[in-house]
A protein has these predicted regions:
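Carbohydrate-associated surface elements
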Residues: 147, 165
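Conserved acidic donor-binding segment of nucleotide-sugar-dependent glycosyltransferases
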Residues: 296-297, 301-308, 317-322
Length: 358
């Protein structure tokens, strides 16, 4: 079977990680291609037999070129879809999904579109309008959260709840144990939605002994990095800013706790990856699916959005009680089978067969 994925870029994001993981898993038995909009190389390793196609690049430096190049890119996408005959197209992320629906007009190949953020994350009124207008014309839509499934079923005929696979499921034995260090992690883009400021303020509200005895690391890059470094200094907290990192595994192996501070999420990769490394997860009750991944006080902890005091109290609770932390991560490991690549791959193939035979 010929399967073609479409995505804007293969940078270090969570959705990009998922696409590469799926492509690598499917290419062992199927012919897999990836069409991407941007010229940059894939941040994640692709198997050699995955065909990578980059659309023609256009200028975006002036208003005229921004408008003209969007139209040219749409035509380039349509041309690529025509030239790469496939049994199914699978597009990732909202604006790419919209572009693919319009670019596929008149083509018979079924299109599955895949959402990787909560529906509320898309703020632009124009893009929300285009999403509402175009999504009914896809052949199927995959979503990550139960609330998103309910939302999209109002206007999309076939909506499937498909969790993200975790590439660590083939690398890490669930019987494996890790020598932990006094390390607390924040991993993610440094932007307003991920709210890393909350992490810094929570550290500042910790017991002083804990601040001295633990290392706090921010792994990720983005528009707020410089501001956050100044913020850490002004709060008087010691935080290491590592920037974008390739070997996140080494951090998970050492870390005792991971903090997620987002306002809006789909199915956060870090809350899944950390399961395999016995990292205790503390997350905001982000809009609108934290309960899909964490049962509060059983296999992790939930706190209110932007509530740094609550985050600090949960951190103190876990960091002062190692047995509690171990109990939490033991319970959390039970979720790992939900994200095994073989399990998710099977679900994707079932959905592909469904749209092909519809």
């Amino acid at each position: 079977m010929k399967i073609t994925f479409i995505i804007a870029t293969l940078n270090s994001g969570g959705a990009e990680r998922v696409l590469v993981t799926l492509a690598n898993a499917l290419c062992t038995q199927h012919e897999v291609s990836i069409i991407k909009f941007h010229a940059s190389d894939s941040f994640y390793k692709l198997e050699e037999n995955v065909k990578l196609i980059t659309l023609e690049q256009f200028r975006f430096d002036t208003l005229y070129h921004k408008i003209a190049s969007r139209f040219k890119k749409y035509l380039a996408l349509r041309r690529a879809l025509k030239e790469n005959e496939s049994d199914v197209f699978i597009s990732f992320l909202d604006t790419t999904n919209i572009a693919c629906i319009f670019a596929k007009i008149g083509l018979k190949t079924p299109l599955i579109i895949s959402e990787h953020s909560n529906e509320a994350y898309l703020k632009s009124k124009i893009w929300r309008f285009l999403r509402r207008l175009s999504y009914p014309f896809c052949d199927a839509l995959s979503v990550l959260g139960s609330s998103d499934k309910i939302y999209y079923e109002k206007f999309v005929k076939r909506v499937k709840l498909l969790p993200n696979p975790c590439h660590f499921s083939t690398e890490i034995s669930l019987n494996e144990h890790f020598e932990k260090e006094n390390l607390v992690l924040f991993i993610g883009r440094l932007d307003q939605n991920k709210n890393p400021q909350m992490f810094l303020k929570a550290i500042a509200n910790l017991d002083k002994k804990l601040q001295e005895n633990y290392e706090f690391i921010v792994a990720g890059d983005g528009e707020l990095r410089q501001e956050l470094e100044y913020k850490a200094k002004s709060l008087g907290v010691k935080v290491k800013f590592l920037g974008r990192i390739e070997n996140v595994k080494a951090l998970y192996e050492k870390a005792k706790v991971l903090c997620l501070c987002s306002f809006v999420e789909g199915l956060p990769t870090v809350l899944i990856e950390s399961l395999y490394f016995e990292v205790c997860r503390i997350s905001t009750s982000y809009y609108n699916g934290a309960k899909d991944l964490i049962s509060d006080n059983e296999d992790g902890f939930l706190v209110g959005c932007d509530d740094e005091i609550a985050l600090a109290r949960k951190l103190e609770l876990v960091l002062k009680d190692e047995q509690l932390r171990k109990n939490i991560v033991t319970n959390a490991k039970k979720r790992c089978e939900d994200f095994e690549i073989s399990h998710i791959k099977k679900q994707w193939l079932e959905l592909i067969d469904e749209v092909k035979n519809a």
